[in-house]
Amino acid sequence: MEGFFWKTLLVVGALAIGGTSSLPHKPLTYEEAVDLAVSIYNSKSGEDSLYRLLEAVPPPEWDPLSESNQELNFTIKETVCLVAEERSLEECDFQEDGAIMGCTGYYFFGESPPVLVLTCKPVGEEEEQKQEEGNEEEKEVEKEEKEEDEKDQPRRVKRFKKFFKKLKNSVKKRAKKFFKKPRVIGVSIPF
């Protein structure tokens, strides 16, 4: 009888071990993954205001049980709540003119613990910059034409001035783009 008990215990133990999940992480639905990413953005971005999910479209290939990399794409918007208040996001309304951020995140579930890399940048900022740059260029061209008409300078001097102004504008644009980097956050996720 004693041998039967140990054999039974061995079989039950083997089944229990084989029946447990071999995943190194807790399975996440797309909604849970996005909520976690928004929470991490709010805690690590250094912003004064909390951001809340505006839109998220789950990709058809999202697999909560996958051990491979998973991609997130979502949009968040600034709320009236401050980070220091530590309020629930459900209590926070969107700001009327709040900043809207387009975010892309990558979960690396193959790592132990899993890692999230999140990149968020303002939506529509590129279009606004192009419009501003176009307006500035037009104003400068008009200003240059007026200056050239007023002064009676040799043609060579005018060409050099025009060239250096274009060069100066180009450097300004590149400097603006360089210093307006999107926020990138990387964290490991303990499950």
Swiss-Prot record:
Keywords tagged on the record: Antibiotic, Antimicrobial, Cleavage on pair of basic residues, Disulfide bond, Membrane, Secreted, Signal, Target cell membrane, Target membrane
InterPro entries found in the cross-reference section: Cathelicidin-like, Cystatin_sf
Biological source species: Ophiophagus hannah (King cobra)
An individual GO BP term: killing of cells of another organism
The protein's name in its UniProt record: Cathelicidin-related peptide Oh-Cath
GO (cellular component) term, any one: extracellular space
Similarity remark: Belongs to the cathelicidin family.
Tissue expression remark: Expressed by the venom gland.
Known function: Potent antimicrobial peptide against Gram-negative (MIC=0.25 ug/ml against E.coli ATCC 25922, MIC=0.5 ug/ml against P.aeruginosa) and Gram-positive bacteria (MIC=64 ug/ml against E.faecalis, MIC=64 ug/ml against S.aureus). Adopts an amphipathic alpha helical conformation, that may allow to partition into the target membrane. Low hemolytic activities have been observed on mammalian cells.
Disulfide bonds: 81-92, 103-120
Further details from the record: The peptide length (30 residues) shown here is propagated from the directly sequenced mature cathelicidin-BF. A longer peptide (34 residues) with predicted cleavage site located at position Val-157-158-Lys is proposed in PubMed:18620012. This 30 residues peptide could result from a further processing.
Comp. bias (Acidic residues): 125-151
Subcellular location: Secreted; Target cell membrane
Residues that make up the propeptide removed upon maturation: 23-161
Extent of the signal sequence: 1-22
